[in-house]
Amino acid sequence: MYPGMLSEKRTNALPRGEIARGKSAVSRLFSQGGRLKGGFLLLIYSASRPVEQAPRIPVRVLFTVGKKLVPRAVDRNRIKRLMREAYRLEKNILTRALAFDAGKGDHQVMLAFLYRARADAIPSLERFRAEIRHMLKNLLSNRLPQTREGDRIE
């Protein structure tokens, strides 16, 4: 196989199951979720009972870029790729802190990263990583709801 071929197994990719899907779940996240503002990203988050399709996935994530802010599809796709890669590299902050065990985990965290800046200068991967790292640490420090036992989901 040649490097980069589609049939090659991608071990470092963000798993499909971690991508938030479903109109009802996404609309519930946008209507009821908490918000964290960053420099050029907005994070919408909520912790809830796991959905039936993915009960063992502790975190589901969504990436979006508005067409009004970034009119060219090429730029929107590049920004989403950068956000996905930055999240993939920084998600261990969240997954380690959640210490999710499939047998006892009773919450699922849903995240939506929204790009809020213009397409004039697309931030670098390092800037995306720094922004996402800061947002995830802020989310863990004081934003996630309490569990049934009264302990923070950490």
Curated annotation (Swiss-Prot):
**A GO biological process held by the record:** tRNA 5'-leader removal
Give the UniProt keywords, A-Z.
Endonuclease, Hydrolase, Nuclease, RNA-binding, tRNA processing
Q: Which InterPro entries match?
A: Ribosomal_Su5_D2-typ_SF (IPR020568), Ribsml_uS5_D2-typ_fold_subgr (IPR014721), RNase_P (IPR000100), RNase_P_CS (IPR020539)
SUPFAM superfamilies cross-referenced by the UniProt entry: Ribosomal protein S5 domain 2-like
Q: What are the transmembrane regions?
A: none
Gene3D superfamilies, per database record: 3.30.230.10
Tagged with keyword tRNA processing: yes
What Pfam families does its record include? Ribonuclease_P (PF00825)
Highest rank taxon of the organism: Bacteria
Record has Metal-binding as a keyword: no
Q: Write out the GO MF terms.
A: ribonuclease P activity; tRNA binding
List the PROSITE patterns: RIBONUCLEASE_P
Q: What catalytic activity does the UniProt entry give for this protein? A: Endonucleolytic cleavage of RNA, removing 5'-extranucleotides from tRNA precursor
Q: What's the EC number here?
A: 3.1.26.5
- Note the subunit structure: Consists of a catalytic RNA component (M1 or rnpB) and a protein subunit.
NCBIfam families given in the database record: PRK01903.1-1
The protein's role, per its UniProt record: RNaseP catalyzes the removal of the 5'-leader sequence from pre-tRNA to produce the mature 5'-terminus. It can also cleave other RNA substrates such as 4.5S RNA. The protein component plays an auxiliary but essential role in vivo by binding to the 5'-leader sequence and broadening the substrate specificity of the ribozyme.
Q: Which family does it belong to?
A: Belongs to the RnpA family.
Official protein name in the record: Ribonuclease P protein component
Organism equals: Chlorobaculum tepidum (strain ATCC 49652 / DSM 12025 / NBRC 103806 / TLS) (Chlorobium tepidum)
Which gene is this protein's source? rnpA
